[in-house]
């Protein structure tokens, strides 16, 4: 059974978690996810949506597989999950997670690997690892600290408190919170908007933010000039400058451009 698949419509790609109702991270998960990410990377998509079949985004790790395993097995399992999530972060296109129901543990971390999270009002995000004596194993703690601050990240990781869709929106974890019936449509609308945007500019923005995450403002400042200059001769930038200059000459707002991603 194919538990994760890659689909596309024109330049909008989609990775579907297809193991409902819980979409757990079992032993097959990382390999299937990496394969789907590679398919996305090798295609000419300009945006990627990650969504799930069934009532829940993902309940996280399939803990029933873990008892009786040794530490070397668990280390490899955790490493493979992290590699698959970092592969998503390494893509050169914007990424969107469409989350309904529960996003627990590794499911929460999968959503946090994306640039945008569209959350249903019934969504519940939770770092459940503390209930097993573990901590978030695929990057939730540090990514939460980056988004909501160290204090809140400690609270959510150490106390395992659930985060409602509404609270996720208030804290900036979720980009937008909508009715459950509107999650996919909202994510697809955002994806279509990004798919006709300046793709290289989006990739550069992601690169600069990664530099900031790694080394703060000094690290981002150190690479910002080169990243900016790489955009200067792109077709999108050339057309964008011209469109804006012409609008200024006519004393009006620049018209919306359909960028070609080059």
Which sequence ranges carry the predicted segments?
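Hydrophobic alpha-helical membrane-association signature
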Residues: 29-33, 77-80, 183, 224
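Glycine- (often His-adjacent) and acidic-residue-rich active-site loop
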Residues: 32, 52-87, 103, 133
């Amino acid at each position: 059974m194919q538990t994760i698949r890659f689909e596309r419509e024109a330049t909008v790609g989609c990775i579907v978690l297809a193991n409902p109702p819980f979409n757990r991270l079992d032993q097959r998960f990382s390999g299937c996810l990496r394969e789907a990410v590679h398919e996305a990377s090798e295609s000419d998509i300009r945006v990627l949506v990650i969504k799930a079949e069934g009532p829940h985004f993902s309940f996280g790790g399939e803990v029933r597989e873990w008892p009786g395993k040794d530490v070397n097995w668990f280390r490899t399992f955790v490493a493979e999950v992290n590699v698959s999530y970092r592969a998503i972060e390494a893509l050169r296109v914007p990424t969107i997670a469409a989350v309904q129901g529960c996003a627990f543990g590794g499911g929460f971390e999968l959503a946090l690997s994306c640039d945008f999270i569209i959350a249903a009002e019934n969504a519940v995000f939770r770092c459940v690892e503390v209930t097993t004596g573990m901590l978030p194993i695929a990057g939730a703690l540090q990514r939460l600290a980056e988004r909501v601050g160290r204090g809140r990240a400690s609270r959510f990781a150490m106390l395992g408190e659930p985060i409602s869709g509404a609270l996720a929106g208030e804290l900036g974890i979720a980009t937008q919170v909508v009715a459950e019936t509107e999650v996919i449509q909202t994510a697809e609308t955002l994806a279509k908007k990004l798919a006709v945007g300046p793709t290289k500019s989006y990739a550069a923005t992601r690169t600069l933010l990664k530099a900031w995450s790694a080394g703060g403002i000094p690290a981002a400042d150190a690479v910002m000039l080169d990243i900016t200059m790489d955009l200067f001769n792109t077709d999108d930038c050339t057309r964008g400058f011209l469109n804006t200059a012409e609008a200024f000459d006519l004393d009006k707002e620049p018209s919306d451009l359909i960028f070609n991603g080059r």
